[in-house]
Amino acid sequence: MEQQQQKSAVHVSKLFVCTAVDCKDEIEEKFERSYASLQQQIAGLSDKEMHDMLTQFVCKEKQHEEISIGFLYIILTDPAMAPKTYRDITLVSRDGMNVIVANLTLLVAEKYTKLTETARRQLIWVLREFVKHQVLSVENVIWNCLRQAGGGDVSHKNLFLVESLLDIFIEYRAWLETNPFLVQSSVYSFVRLIEDHANPALISLRQKEVKFTISLIRDRFHDIIPLGRDFVRLLQNVARIPEFEQLWRDILYNPKSLHPTFNGIWHLLQIRTSRRFLQCRLLPEMERKLHFLASSVKFGNQKRYQDWFQDKYFATPESHSLRSDLIRFIINVIHPTNDMLCSDIIPRWAIIGWLISSCTNPIASANAKLSLFYDWLFFDPAKDNIMNIEPGILVMYHSIRNHPFVSSTLLDFLCRITKNFYIKNEDKIRLGVYNSLKLILDKQVIPNLHPLFESPKLDRELRNLIRENFREFVSPVSNMPQTMYPATHSIQAPIFKKEADQRITQIENIDVGAGVLAANSSTISLVDDDSKVATIPTESLERETEAVFSDEDGENLGRCTKNEENTDDDDDLPLSKVRLKEKPVPEKVELPEAIAESFEIFVTKRNSFTWEAFLKDFRTLPASTLDETQLNYVISNTVLILRETLPQQNVFSESKTEEKCLAKSISYPLYGLFRFLYENEDKSKKPFQSLLSEICERLSETGYLLLYFMKIHCKLQTRKNAQQSYQFKTTVYRQICEATDGKIASCLVRDLDLLEKENTTIYLWLLPDIYREFKTIAINNTDLLRITLRCVDAKNVRDIMYSIAQGKMTIFKQDGLIECIRESLEYETYEQFCLWQLIQAHDVPLKCIQDILPELEAANHPEALSHLLLLLKNEEPTNEIIRLLLSREAKSRGDPFVTSALRFWCQRCEEKLSEIIASLLTSKYPSSSPNKRKRPSKGSSAASSTPSADHVLNHLEHYRRSCRHGTGTGLYVHDMMQRALQSAYTHSNESTKKQFSDLFALAAEDETTAVGRRGGSGRGRKQPAGKKDSNNHSAGSKKNSDVVKAIYSSDESSSEEDWSKHKITQAAKKRKKAINDSD
């Protein structure tokens, strides 16, 4: 019994807080063991004796790591000994403290919550020392410390960490600014933390945070821009603070003052925030629990886990703000596999539904809903992931039966936020929501929207609000079956401020200058043109009860009372009549005589002929003739008629050859405008320009319908007059772009994007004409290329390749193609395979794209590497290609891409390949003759990607290992390669000799190089011991960096086995003997 007590007393840790039931894990045991070992070795020694002894010990990798961790343990547990220990560590460390930084990173990421108070204070002390002396990779430790500074936590322990990190950043600001990623992470974190520090007791800390953050944002705004839309979401919550209010003014009204390339708030909102920044706002422990909940807990068994999570992380009033961080993380980071989606694991929407429905704070609840729908507001199918919008629709769809209050509240919020989030760009917000819903239906995330949008459990007011906001997705109840899937969708008719129905109750306008409202104002919105904020009262948002998602059935929750039928209900009206009923009818205005008659006829007859007659009168009308009221009257009626006369379905011709169908498809009044512009290209008066501008702004389909019109018009005119060839008049399209103050390149991409979403067949039909008529814009245009690749199938790719082969279409030119390939590395696998098919169809020579070889990674870019390998097989090895290949980073297990290329070249031209590599290796050493060095040509990129000697040796070593049973070993036995290896051995340090001892052993003994090894035995005799040391060294070097890589990066992996060197050594000796005999 006494022995057990003594044993337990011995194991009391000074570094970790442990309870009686805690078991030590590998990390804790490692630190304790290293400390005990160090104490045994240095006990009773003087400083000099300790340094001498430790200097001998650290030569071996294992002892070096053990001693380093032991010293780190002393620093963290003994404040009095910390300065002396830090000095000792700098004397004995032989890797720039890499081992210490790697283990400290692991300690902070995995065990920070278990550190004693002394250890946490000493952690800050050692971090300050590391930053002061600019120790490499210390930013990894600081980033993990930032993660431990949790949101929604105002405990003394958390505030100490926050303030300590802030002091380090302020004191060493110059060092901080050298690391853009750390600048971004610190700004994102502190803007989030400032929100939690509103308590008057924390005013001094909050003021210090505000001053530092604002200063860093303004000084380093070019680094802040990539933070994207979630950074704007965080800025909204602190917008009432005077310094942030001024920042908002500059963002909204004077963006160029922040950075010359910054174009305003919409610039930020279009950028998706990186997962790393969303991740940094969750504690590592919390992240692990969340991953467990979303990947291991079965649906129906989650209640006890949710209760535990609630008690652990949502116990204080301040912790409610954490829900938004969790929802953003779940939506953007946790993307389950198909197998998980088909399993009985709890889905993401259920976790999010629980987080929202269990929130009792109205401000936090509104912010949580915004987090759920935030990606909807800016959704672009070309760039954004459907997984980011899927939870929003599913939580509403699956809650409507058992939790109708959750669904109704979320639908109400979505309707109101669409209109009021950013009034100035309401049209773009609506387009984002429209794109989201359309893609949800196209991908059949849910069968259709009818059970949700027209559920009898929704109250009448909400159903009207849904119909008003999502009229494109609402159909007459009487004509729609219960589970009908919407087969077609009409072109979106954007809603504009002038036409918007102001039915939102209790809307108030608060003058806050430029200040976007803060979260504590109980509203969510962005500022409009008049510095007013249209606000949504949270009272109208908070209509749900506490409907907790659990394994219990929610049938007993409150139900919506059944609405009584009203004779005024327009549910039974056709949708077209509902739209007419809702549209405001402009009051009639007297117009000038020059246009009054023709305009009246056009309004009455609504056809292309009367429309073109009116345009002829209106085009020459001077600005002085019309006042603003008259002009608005003309514009409103015109846009209304043009929109209503366009067919809701089948806007394009069903046949591409039949003249009757083609002519009918461009017979509507909007095409009359295009025909008029086609025939009248000279400059028009200001009223006509205003009319044209408004039509383009309000009818988003104008641009692509004009492209369609030009294709049909030219086709029909050419058939009428076969002797004359009619071409696109790009000047007409340019006129449309100028009317909207847009650049033709961006307008073209936008219009083609909309066209592809509306009708892929017509888009592909127009594509050759686009590349021919807009070739300066279209060729090598990555945006247009991405639109094409996302919609093509195998037959479409075949047809495009036919057009390229026949010379009818050119997608790429050699100059700039490499930039297209670089950007395509982020595309989906199928899209990249299609891209390489198109590149091959252009017969692009390898030399135009070979510079990208060093940039490609085996783990991340398999598509590009696969196709480049096939291209390399058709090439002969050259100095330039080999230089680029050997510039590639050689991972711990080699580069299979380089090995494969060398292997198939060895089969065809082994001697030439050996000479090129030998020449490149020889040129890396000072004793080599300058005349023998292969100098790059003027057009090459030698300066940027020249391999070092270690790079070349690494690739040769991994190639050696791949040559099992001696196959392919002839590369090493040629004269130049033998001399190159001997020269490399002569000029290498001991570490390199040990690392590549097996490779150097392939160079046969040469008496002429014996001077390079004076006094030493031959390499063949030294090899066995050297091989063992080399393996130990390589393993130790890899271990030092594996800890940080596991947290901060991901490594590539490939499988290449080592091989027996016996046969290759024999081959080398035979080759050398033959040379000597011939001499």
Swiss-Prot record:
> Which residues get modified to Phosphoserine?
1049-1050, 1054-1055
Q: Where is the composition biased (Basic residues)?
A: 1062-1073
Q: Mind naming one GO cellular-component term on file for this protein?
A: nucleus
What disulfide bonds does the UniProt entry report for this chain?
A: none
Compartments annotated for it: namely: Nucleus; Cytoplasm
Q: Which family does it belong to?
A: Belongs to the Integrator subunit 3 family.
Q: Which domain of life is it from?
A: Eukaryota
Checking PANTHER family in the record gives:
INTEGRATOR COMPLEX SUBUNIT 3 (PTHR13587:SF7)
UniProt keyword list: Cytoplasm, Nucleus, Phosphoprotein
Q: What organism does the UniProt record list as the source?
A: Drosophila mojavensis (Fruit fly)
User: Sorted alphabetically, which InterPro entries does this protein's record hold?
Assistant: HEAT_Ints3_C, INTS3, INTS3_N
Residue ranges, annotated region (Disordered): 544-574, 925-949, 1010-1079
* Biased composition regions of type Low complexity, renumbered to the chain: 938-949
Protein name, UniProt field: Integrator complex subunit 3 homolog
The free-text function statement in the UniProt record for this protein reads: Component of the integrator complex, a multiprotein complex that terminates RNA polymerase II (Pol II) transcription in the promoter-proximal region of genes. The integrator complex provides a quality checkpoint during transcription elongation by driving premature transcription termination of transcripts that are unfavorably configured for transcriptional elongation: the complex terminates transcription by (1) catalyzing dephosphorylation of the C-terminal domain (CTD) of Pol II subunit Polr2A/Rbp1 and Spt5, and (2) degrading the exiting nascent RNA transcript via endonuclease activity.
Assembly and partners are described as: Belongs to the multiprotein complex Integrator, at least composed of IntS1, IntS2, IntS3, IntS4, omd/IntS5, IntS6, defl/IntS7, IntS8, IntS9, IntS10, IntS11, IntS12, asun/IntS13, IntS14 and IntS15. The core complex associates with protein phosphatase 2A subunits mts/PP2A and Pp2A-29B, to form the Integrator-PP2A (INTAC) complex.
